[in-house]
A protein has these predicted regions:
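Helix-loop-beta element that forms the nucleotide-linked donor phosphate-binding surface
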Residues: 121-126
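Short glycine-/acidic-enriched loop or helix-start segments at secondary-structure transitions
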Residues: 95-96, 119-120
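Structural signature of tandem-repeat unit edges
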Residues: 1-8, 18-33, 41-45, 51-69, ...
Length: 135
């Protein structure tokens, strides 16, 4: 469980944590930013905070109500990501490829009454279905 006091998760924070299957955030989370990035010259290098974690299946950010930005490639290549919950009512800004390569059957759960806003927002459209947290 990531402590409520964390405001930023930097790029590559979980790089190499291949056994990580679930990420949860403590109630009252102050998280505002999840870092990321991408570099390409002769070969590509992705450095999102949670990118390319082959066993990551669930991210529960339902306690996070203040997210502003999800960085480039933050969850890139998380092929097993099936459930993503977020408590922020206004869809956070997602930079390029934030959710590229996630499971094609992935579910996004958002605060009640906010599903349409997430469905219309760039990058959030990558989720197969979007429903309320209470559904």
């Amino acid at each position: 469980e990531i402590p409520a006091s964390v405001e930023t998760i930097e790029a590559t924070a979980f790089k190499g944590c291949s056994s990580l299957a679930t990420v949860t955030f403590e109630k009252g989370s102050q998280l505002k930013t999840i870092g990321g990035g991408y570099y390409s010259y002769s070969s590509s290098y992705y450095y999102g905070a949670f990118c390319q974690l082959k066993n990551l299946m669930t991210v529960d950010m339902s306690a996070c109500t203040q997210i502003e930005t999800i960085g480039e490639c933050a969850f890139y290549g998380d092929f097993e990501l099936r459930l993503f919950k977020i408590g922020t009512e206004i869809p956070p800004t997602c930079e390029n490829y934030a959710f590229s390569g996630i499971n094609p059957y992935s579910v996004l759960k958002v605060p009640s009454g906010c599903a349409d806003a997430y469905k219309a927002a760039t990058e959030w459209k990558r989720f197969a279905s979007t429903t309320g947290l209470d559904e």
